[in-house]
Amino acid sequence: MFAIICMNSLNCNRNGRISSRASLICLHTLSLVSFSFLANITCKSSSLTPAGIIESIPVVFTAVVSVLRCLIEEVLVTVSVVLFKISLGAIPKILRKVLVLYIILYYIILY
């Protein structure tokens, strides 16, 4: 529970809202995995043995992969926005409008 509170405080902006969709996904993924990891440890009597620890590895691996996917998505979105802002100066107005509509439709379909 402490890790969830820490992640929530790290991902909130000044208004107390989650700063981005990817951060929200990461927060939910971490909370879900931490609860399932704790349930896996507390529900099994043999969980403190090496076999119980080995059974918990897929849960931890899933958490790490999910968080890495969220972070990679966040970096890709940031890079695409920066490149889009840089390229606006070199594109005529008509193509600029088409590009803006394309990006808006892309994010609507993506989410």
UniProtKB/Swiss-Prot annotation:
Spans through the membrane: 22-42, 48-68, 75-95
Topology of the protein relative to the lipid bilayer: Multi-pass membrane protein
Miscellaneous comment as given in the Swiss-Prot or TrEMBL entry: Partially overlaps PGD1.
Protein name: Putative uncharacterized protein YGL024W
Subcellular location: Membrane
Chief localisation class: membrane
Signal peptide span: none
CC per GO annotation: membrane
Lineage, broadest ranks: Eukaryota, Fungi, Dikarya, Ascomycota, Saccharomycotina
Transferase keyword on record: no
UniProt keyword annotations, A-Z: Membrane, Transmembrane, Transmembrane helix
